[in-house]
A protein has these predicted regions:
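Gly/Trp-centered helix-boundary motif
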Residues: 1-109, 113, 135
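Generic hydrophobic transmembrane alpha-helix motif, especially the helices
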Residues: 72, 103-110, 116-170
């Protein structure tokens, strides 16, 4: 048997023996499935203003409206289903995380590789910038950047990129 296949089978045997790891993997794939297929899984579209009924505002969890739709987590002040809002919010969160992570990886890898290639004063300068940035708490720095730029998904992506690139450059 190929040593790589043997190693992979050994890993899977050890992994599948750990019940917590299997449960975490199942939850991960469930969240990923819900995020990717939210329009098909969610009961309603929270962004579709024609389906939102103000008469259904602030319903408690498990309530039904006049048409018989059950709101398992209730509704918000505008009458939107909270389960649907969570499912659609997962899509946005997953997109922000993946996109900002990939862009930060690209920028950080560029500066890290270029610093290693050119050496000397350029490497010292880039690594001091990285050291200065890594000396601040990431969440605090991201909140300061968002406070300076304003709120919004695009500003959040920019803040995450500006905070994360240094980890990849190091």
């Amino acid at each position: 048997m190929n040593p790589k296949i043997k190693k992979a089978l050994s890993f899977w045997r050890d992994f599948s023996a750990n019940k917590i790891a299997v449960a975490a993997l199942a939850i991960f794939f469930l969240v990923l499935f819900v995020a990717l297929f939210a329009p098909f899984v969610a009961p309603t579209n929270p962004y579709d203003l024609t389906s939102v009924d103000i008469m259904n505002s602030r319903l408690s969890p498990g309530s039904e409206d006049f048409s018989g739709i059950t709101f398992w987590l209730g509704t918000d002040g505008a009458g939107r289903d909270m389960v649907s809002a969570i499912f659609y919010g997962l899509r946005v969160s997953l997109g922000v995380g993946v996109f900002s992570g990939l862009v930060a990886l690209t920028i950080g890898a560029f500066f890290g590789i270029s610093a290693a290639f050119f050496r000397g004063k350029y490497e010292t300068f880039v690594m001091r910038i990285v050291d200065i940035q890594l000396s601040f708490p990431s969440i605090l720095l991201a909140l300061i950047i968002i406070a300076a730029f304003g709120k919004g998904v695009d500003k959040t992506i920019i803040a995450l990129i500006l905070v994360q690139w240094a980890y990849y450059a190091r």
